[in-house]
């Protein structure tokens, strides 16, 4: 998403934790992300299908070009900050397909192995017609879909205060049920770039974004987290490994 996030990502990868990394390919810093991932081919890489741009003063637009998908962008040519704002603009589904296809093709051209797709802010699967389109594209390109392998999605540490994120992650490990669980994390470093980000979708955005993302990085790379995994006999696997174990044909649309 940004240079600060990429620095945090590299630190997480170098810690040795098996991770799956979802890339915002319309984002300004995606090429740096790709460079990092090329140095670490064991990392499972996904496309964070993106139809929104939510950060004040730090925005992105379509890979396919603003003039190609005019119903997906605001007056300034950027993605709308929320799924609701996009839907109010009555997006042309053909343009949604054009853009998602462009993101997938950019990812495949990048030179890193792409294993799966997931969904920035959930928008690519939030409406029935969007979900059906995303499913069709995943099948066409032979990609896994996050949430389609029976995984339980977890991210309780996101809203915990920076100093409490370690406690939140350990508590999550302690209550995990048998099966596949995805812990959705957002890492970064505590610097001015990341600290300036404000979510436009709420009057009460998560404060001190840089400290929160540094807190997640610190929690994930802490000896305490590693010990909790060992104590509970929790095995970390990537989406690449999950797909290898279950196969793409095992994918099922999640209930609800």
Task: Give residue ranges: language-model regions.
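Active-site beta-loop-alpha junctions enriched in small/polar residues
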Residues: 24-26, 48-54, 122, 150-153, ...
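Acidic (Asp/Glu)-rich catalytic clusters
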Residues: 9-16, 30-44, 61-74, 109, ...
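C-terminal domain-boundary segment and adjacent tail
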Residues: 145-148, 202-256
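Structural preference for beta-strand elements that scaffold enzyme active sites
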Residues: 18-20, 42-48, 114-118, 144, ...
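Catalytic domains of cell-wall/extracellular-matrix polysaccharide-remodeling enzymes
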Residues: 90-170, 174
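Active-site gating loops and adjacent loop-to-helix segments of metal-dependent hydrolytic enzymes
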Residues: 58-87, 198-209
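Aromatic-lined glycan-binding groove of carbohydrate-active enzymes
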Residues: 134, 142-144, 170-195, 237
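Histidine/acidic-residue-rich catalytic or RNA/ligand-binding cores of hydrolases
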Residues: 5-6, 56-61, 130-131, 158-165, ...
């Amino acid at each position: 998403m940004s240079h600060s996030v990429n620095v945090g990502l590299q630190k997480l990868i170098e810690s040795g934790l098996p991770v799956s990394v979802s890339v915002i390919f319309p984002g300004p810093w995606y090429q740096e992300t790709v460079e990092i991932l090329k140095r670490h081919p064991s990392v499972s890489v996904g496309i964070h299908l993106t139809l929104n741009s939510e950060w004040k003063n730090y925005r992105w637009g379509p890979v396919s070009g603003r003039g190609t998908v005019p119903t997906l962008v605001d007056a300034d040519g950027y993605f709308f900050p929320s799924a609701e704002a996009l839907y109010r603009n009555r997006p042309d589904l053909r343009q949604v397909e054009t853009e998602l296809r462009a993101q997938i093709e950019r990812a495949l051209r990048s030179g890193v192995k792409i294993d799966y797709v997931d969904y920035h802010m959930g928008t690519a699967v939030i409406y029935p017609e969007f979900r059906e389109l995303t499913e069709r594209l995943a099948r066409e390109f032979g990609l896994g879909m996050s949430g389609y392998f029976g995984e339980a999605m977890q991210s309780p540490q996101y809203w915990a205060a920076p100093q409490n994120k370690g406690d939140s992650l350990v508590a999550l490990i302690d209550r995990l049920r048998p099966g596949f669980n995805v812990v959705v994390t957002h890492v970064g470093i505590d610097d001015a770039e990341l600290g300036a980000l404000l979510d436009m979708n709420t009057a009460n955005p998560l404060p001190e974004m840089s400290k929160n993302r540094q807190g997640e990085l610190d929690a994930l790379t802490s000896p305490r987290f590693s010990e909790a995994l060992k104590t509970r006999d929790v095995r970390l696997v990537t989406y690449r490994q999950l797909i290898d174990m279950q196969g793409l044909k095992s994918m099922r649309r999640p209930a609800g």
